[in-house]
Design a protein with these regions (language model features):
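N-terminal capping/small domains of soluble enzymes
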Residues: 1-91, 95-101, 297
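Glycine-rich phosphate-binding active-site loops on the catalytic face of alpha/beta enzymes
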Residues: 43-48, 123-124, 128-130, 197-207, ...
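Alpha/beta catalytic cores of nucleotide-metabolism and tRNA/nucleoside-modifying enzymes
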Residues: 231-254, 264-323
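Conserved, mostly hydrophobic/aromatic
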Residues: 18, 41, 80, 93, ...
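C-terminal helical cap(s) of enzyme catalytic domains, especially alpha/beta-barrels
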Residues: 51-64, 208-226, 285-311
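Short beta-strand/loop segments at the ligand-binding rim of alpha/beta enzyme cores
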Residues: 10-17, 88-92, 159-178, 246-260
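Catalytic cores of alpha/beta
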Residues: 27-33, 103-111, 178-192, 246-250, ...
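Glycine/Thr-rich beta-alpha phosphate-binding loop at enzyme active sites
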Residues: 65, 133-141, 191-255
């Protein structure tokens, strides 16, 4: 059974890895992923400087999923550059900035560490969709800003890596979209640029879960509002993957899709691939189950594929039937 996949020149021995979020901030957590059945190691979304994040409690989960308002706690971008050599698997740095200038500075430093110092950085995932930064909106919901950000990002990326053979793959992490014309607009914007992949979806922002016993919110920041994940968001995640798959297909753009949101079982993984995902990330389930989640979900996916007489994911990827 072949579960391997690729994004551009970067090959993965399976189709399942961690999502940038839980348990990927510190070196020991990254090494734990490196020694697991995750096909890659993706860092916590990093900023220019180290951040403590939002006040606690800032994470809560139940049987249906999770809510968080972490606020991007991370070790600062130099930390993830420094320890890249400790990781054997494909290593993808997730990054962002609180302004375009900060984002470009972080991106430039990451790329220069690759070109000038041969650091092991295999990919860059630019997070334009964190819903949990107080008083900061999500860039990917402002389409004019999204276009401008991608223009600047791709200019720096292309110029600094112009003579470099195996470039780090470049992708963006998107929020969930809900309107068909939003998929059209964002699909058109992204298709203009040399983007290798998109990750969709990030958590659904400004959700609220209630502790009925105490008649209170379950997390502290933002009046209890946070990003919703887990099973709650799977239908939205599937829809976003499917819509962007169709958008890129009609534009003849080979932009790969990383599906994320509510993947708990092999059946969930199969559904995402059927909708058009090339690679899958797990966040909430990884937080709950730790690294054993990768082996179990991959085993279950293999069983679903065997039952349906599929030998590799290419045989059913994107082939969702409509009725």
């Amino acid at each position: 059974m072949n579960l391997s996949t690729s994004i551009s020149h970067l090959k993965f021995n399976s189709c399942l890895c961690n999502a940038s979020g839980p348990k990927c901030s510190l070196l020991n957590e990254l090494q734990n992923l490196d020694n697991s059945d995750s096909c890659a190691v993706i860092t916590k979304t990093t900023t220019f400087e180290k951040r403590e994040g939002n006040p606690e409690p800032r994470y809560y989960d139940n049987l249906l999923g999770s809510i968080n308002s972490m606020g991007l706690p991370n070790q600062g971008h130099n930390y993830y550059i420094k320890y890249s050599e400790k990781i054997k698997k494909p290593y993808i740095i997730s990054m962002t900035g609180f302004s375009l200038d900060e984002l470009i500075t972080v991106l430039t430093n990451i790329i220069i560490s690759k070109t000038n110092f041969n650091k092991k950085i295999d990919g860059i995932e630019i997070n334009l969709s964190c819903p949990n930064i107080i008083d900061k909106g999500q860039i990917a919901y402002d389409f004019e800003s999204l276009d401008n950000y991608l223009k600047e990002i791709c200019f720096i990326y292309s110029n600094l890596l112009e003579k470099f053979d195996e470039k780090p793959i470049l992708g963006i992490k998107l929020p969930p979209y809900f309107e068909i014309h939003h998929f059209e607009t964002v699909g058109e914007i992204i298709s203009k640029y040399p983007i290798d992949f998109i990750t969709c979806i990030n958590s659904i922002g400004n959700a609220l879960l209630i502790d009925i016993k105490n008649e209170s919110a379950v997390i502290k920041p933002k009046g209890g509002m946070g990003g919703l994940g887990g099973s709650y968001v799977k239908p939205t995640g599937l829809s976003n993957v499917r819509n962007f798959y169709l958008q890129f297909k009609k534009r003849n753009r080979d932009i790969k899709i990383i599906g994320c949101g509510g993947i708990e079982t092999g059946k969930d993984a199969f559904e995402y691939i059927l909708c058009g995902a090339d690679l899958l990330q797990i966040g909430t389930q990884f937080y709950k189950e730790d690294v054993s989640s990768f082996k179990r979900i991959l085993k279950e996916l293999t069983e679903v594929m065997k039952y349906k007489n599929y030998n590799n994911i290419e045989q059913f990827k994107g082939k969702l039937k409509t009725i």
